[in-house]
Amino acid sequence: MARREEETKEFEERVVTINRVAKVVKGGRRFRFTALVVVGDKNGRVGFGTGKAQEVPEAIKKAVEAAKKDLVVVPRVEGTTPHTITGRYGSGSVFMKPAAPGTGVIAGGPVRAVLELAGITDILSKSLGSNTPINMVRATIDGLQNLKNAEDVAKLRGKTVEELYN
């Protein structure tokens, strides 16, 4: 039991959207709730999950559990991303550009939640195409997954980090 309590404190969670969905049956409509939640430790790990249940708190709980099972590690350089990247999912795309210290997180709604919980403090971003919250979150995560730091690029090219910058 103590381990689960530690795990809960480790991650911060943010509810992005809660949506009421209806199933039409012979007797009328049956309502359920879907929740989209982003979790992160503000130290380079972030994930998202969706949950569906008859009550809102239960849907959020399911979404948090799903999010913790699907975490991504985000490379960061001085509170921002190592380079410019565009994340895509469906018809939605998110353009992210590193920013100077003190700029802050310039992003809208779902994208902001993901970036802040990933521990990124300075970044410029623009959402393009579909603005559905789930697509925006997935596009942001896609972009963050495709980030590479200088050490990784140097290793791929068989060079040292110093050779890359000269």
UniProtKB/Swiss-Prot annotation:
PROSITE patterns membership: RIBOSOMAL_S5, S5_DSRBD
Q: Name one GO molecular function term.
A: structural constituent of ribosome
- Specify the S5 DRBM domain's residue ranges: 11-74
Which GO biological process categories is it annotated with?
A: translation
Query: What's a single GO CC term here?
Result: cytosolic small ribosomal subunit
Q: What does this protein do?
A: With S4 and S12 plays an important role in translational accuracy.
* Domain statement: The N-terminal domain interacts with the head of the 30S subunit; the C-terminal domain interacts with the body and contacts protein S4. The interaction surface between S4 and S5 is involved in control of translational fidelity.
PANTHER family named among the record's database cross-references: MITOCHONDRIAL RIBOSOMAL PROTEIN S5
What name appears for this protein in its UniProt entry?
A: Small ribosomal subunit protein uS5
Q: Which organism is it from?
A: Staphylococcus aureus (strain NCTC 8325 / PS 47)
